[in-house]
């Protein structure tokens, strides 16, 4: 009995001590299990203050005024207002960082795509280097011949024809060489002038006339006595041919006669024959030499 009574007294004394400690100058810290749940009106007012009024980091006085104004729409404390502004600024910074990262990534991807495209173009057969020469109208590549634009071929033909026309007009006096129908004349062909045909001397222009004087042929023609000189030359050529024929016949007959005659008689006959031949074939009169 005594032991049980003593335990009851200790329990009662301990309870009184806790009450006394609770009533003393040191308060008891009890954690609060409630959280701030903002209402729609409170969030609307805070966002207007942040975006419209430009309040980013309010001081203690502003926090107290904002908290007092927001208590009309629900329970709120000053620390709730302070943390809301801090959290909102952190979200804004994170959003800007993500946006900048997305833009940078997109730009880098576009740059990589452009670089890849340029690399492909640089490796293509058309940009690898100078191609082999080909005929007009065809391009020779790695896979075969590809026909080029026909307009370029027509322009090239027109230029060549215009150059040929200018050459013929300047040096040959020929006209009428044109290009394809509908082609515009080139300025080079339009500014050309037609020259008179020139006759170049093909034979010596100095000859000796009948009177022994030296005469020069006129450019583009010859004097009237040139025809007489030509006829005289033709006559002398005919006489020379006849003399050669007579010599051939003479030697043939003389050789046959020598075989039939004796030695001294043949020599005398040959001398008489030669003297008579030279006298008959000589163009000069007898006794003039």
From Swiss-Prot:
GO BP: axillary shoot meristem initiation; negative regulation of DNA-templated transcription; plant organ development
DNA-binding residues: 31-96
Entry comment describing in which tissues the protein is expressed: Expressed in young leaf primordia. Expressed in branch an floral meristems. Transiently expressed in the shoot apex.
SMART domains with a match to the protein in the record: HOX
Record keywords, A-Z: Developmental protein, DNA-binding, Homeobox, Nucleus, Transcription, Transcription regulation
Primary localization: nucleus
Ranges annotated as spanning the membrane: none
Feature: compositional bias, Gly residues: 12-25
Region listing for Disordered, in residue ranges: 1-34
Domain of life: Eukaryota
Comp. bias regions, Low complexity: 1-11
Pfam families to which the protein is assigned, alphabetical: Homeodomain (PF00046)
Disulfide bonds: none
Locations listed in the record: Nucleus
InterPro entries reported in the protein's UniProt record: HD (IPR001356), Homeodomain-like_sf (IPR009057), WUSCHEL-like (IPR044555)
Gene Ontology CC: one annotated term: nucleus
Induction of synthesis: Induced by the cytokinin 6-benzylaminopurine.
Assembly notes: Interacts with TPR1, TPR2 and TPR3.
Reported function: Transcription repressor required for the formation and development of tiller buds and panicles. Required for tiller formation and female sterility. Required for the early developmental stages of axillary meristem formation. Plays a role in maintaining the axillary premeristem zone and in promoting the formation of the axillary meristem by promoting OSH1 expression. Does not seem to be involved in maintenance of the shoot apical meristem (SAM).
Protein name: WUSCHEL-related homeobox 1
Source species of the chain: Oryza sativa subsp. japonica
Classification of source organism: Eukaryota, Viridiplantae, Streptophyta, Embryophyta, Tracheophyta
């Amino acid at each position: 009995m005594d032991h049980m009574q003593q335990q009851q007294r200790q329990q009662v004394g301990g309870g009184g001590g806790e009450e006394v400690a609770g009533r003393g100058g040191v308060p008891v810290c009890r954690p609060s299990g409630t959280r701030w749940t903002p209402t729609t009106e409170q969030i609307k007012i805070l966002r207007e203050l942040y975006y419209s009024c430009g309040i980013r980091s309010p001081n203690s006085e502003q926090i107290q005024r904002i908290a007092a104004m927001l208590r009309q729409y629900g329970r709120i404390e000053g620390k709730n207002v302070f943390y809301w502004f801090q959290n909102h600024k952190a979200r804004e910074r994170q959003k800007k960082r993500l946006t900048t990262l997305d833009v940078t990534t997109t730009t880098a991807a576009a740059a990589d795509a452009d670089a890849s495209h340029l690399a492909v173009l640089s490796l293509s057969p058309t940009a690898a280097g100078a191609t082999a020469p080909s005929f007009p109208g065809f391009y020779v590549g790695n896979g075969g011949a590809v026909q080029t634009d026909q307009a370029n071929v027509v322009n090239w033909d027109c230029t060549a024809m215009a150059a040929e026309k200018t050459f013929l007009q300047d040096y040959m006096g020929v006209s009428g060489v044109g290009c394809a129908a509908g082609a515009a004349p080139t300025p080079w062909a339009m500014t050309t002038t037609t020259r008179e045909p020139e006759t170049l001397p093909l034979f010596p222009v100095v000859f000796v006339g009948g009177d022994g004087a030296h005469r020069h042929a006129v450019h583009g023609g010859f004097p009237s006595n040139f025809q007489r000189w030509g006829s005289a030359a033709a006559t002398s050529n005919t006489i020379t041919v006849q003399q050669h024929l007579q010599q051939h016949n003479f030697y043939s007959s003389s050789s046959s006669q020598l075989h039939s005659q004796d030695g001294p008689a043949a020599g005398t006959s040959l001398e008489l024959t030669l003297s008579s031949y030279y006298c008959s074939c000589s163009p000069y009169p007898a006794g003039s030499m």
